[in-house]
């Protein structure tokens, strides 16, 4: 367990937990990524043709975009030319950038070479500006790649924005030094980093498959945290959140990979996969429903082959809209 308090920080100020807009990237080159499979135990190949996989992934993506928009969430589709080498995981944009309410764009170092090809900040900024978002400043942590030190954005960091706190499970994709550098840059006063362990003994590749934080709730697979750290993490979350504990089996169905969002009229919704929805107990679904309308999306192809689910497909946009 490591709790790092940033020095000389102001008292945490209010910040929105839920974004009203998200970036989504179409899975135009989607397929099994052998590079990421080295430490992502959630990936599994399917005995389907590449063409069938692409068709199914695109259909799942389009249905999710339409469902979010119908619910009132602003979805920005970031398309890109097929000119920089294959990017089979581009559908998971939340791993290479994050945004703030102050209009700041942060770029993050990713562990796998073919995932670094996804990083297209100029094209992203152009797309966002065309959609009326004010991008005021860019910060890059990409230089850490040369040191083999990685921090895969909101894949490895689960943010409690109002409390200026970052929760992070340490792994090959979450380096403690880079984590603390980012926390200092963003002005977050508290970093709670911890170990995780699958039944195989390996760490969980991304924190956001085992936990999610909403405005007044959190979902966490606390049994994946060693006992000597578990109590502290749960106690920290429980200070002002309803804690919903999920099992390893539920985590494997992506119950931790969910995201609370806000609609244009200020209503809360919770995006999740159909697999996760079916794996939650009725009691848990009722608990979640008190925090927002549940939006389950069927993304079985993307989940199985990509090893990531609905939350991984959503990069939150906290940028202000231009007047």
Label the model's feature ranges.
Residues 1-323:
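The feature marks the mature, well-folded catalytic cores of soluble enzymes
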């Amino acid at each position: 367990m490591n709790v790092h308090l940033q020095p000389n920080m102001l008292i945490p100020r209010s910040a929105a937990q839920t974004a009203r807009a998200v970036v989504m990237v179409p899975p135009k080159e989607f397929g099994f990524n052998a590079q990421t499979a080295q430490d992502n135990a959630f990936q599994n190949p399917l005995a389907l043709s590449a063409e069938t996989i692409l068709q199914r992934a695109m259909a799942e993506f389009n249905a999710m975009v339409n469902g979010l928009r119908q619910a009132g969430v602003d979805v920005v589709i970031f398309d890109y030319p097929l000119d920089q080498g294959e990017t089979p995981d581009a559908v998971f944009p939340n791993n290479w950038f994050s945004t703030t309410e102050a209009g700041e764009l942060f770029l993050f170092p990713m562990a796998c070479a073919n995932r670094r090809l996804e990083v297209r900040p100029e094209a992203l900024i152009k797309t966002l500006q065309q959609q009326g978002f004010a991008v005021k400043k860019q910060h890059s942590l990409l230089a850490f790649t040369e040191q083999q030190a990685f921090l895969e954005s909101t894949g490895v960091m689960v943010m409690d924005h109002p409390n200026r706190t970052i929760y992070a499970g340490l792994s090959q994709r979450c380096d403690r030094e880079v984590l603390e550098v980012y926390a200092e840059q963003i002005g977050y006063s508290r970093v709670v980093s911890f170990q995780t362990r699958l039944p195989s003994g390996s760490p969980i590749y991304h924190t956001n498959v085992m936990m999610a934080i909403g405005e007044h709730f959190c979902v966490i697979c606390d049994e994946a945290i060693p006992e000597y750290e578990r109590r502290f993490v749960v106690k920290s979350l429980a200070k002002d959140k309803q804690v919903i504990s999920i099992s390893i089996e539920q985590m494997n169905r992506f119950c931790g990979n969910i995201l609370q969002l806000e609609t244009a009229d200020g209503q809360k919704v919770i995006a999740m996969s159909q697999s996760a929805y079916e794996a939650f107990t009725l009691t848990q679904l009722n608990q979640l429903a008190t925090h927002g309308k549940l939006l389950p999306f069927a993304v079985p192809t993307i989940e199985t082959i990509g090893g990531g689910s609905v939350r991984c497909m959503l990069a939150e946009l906290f940028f202000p809209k231009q007047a």
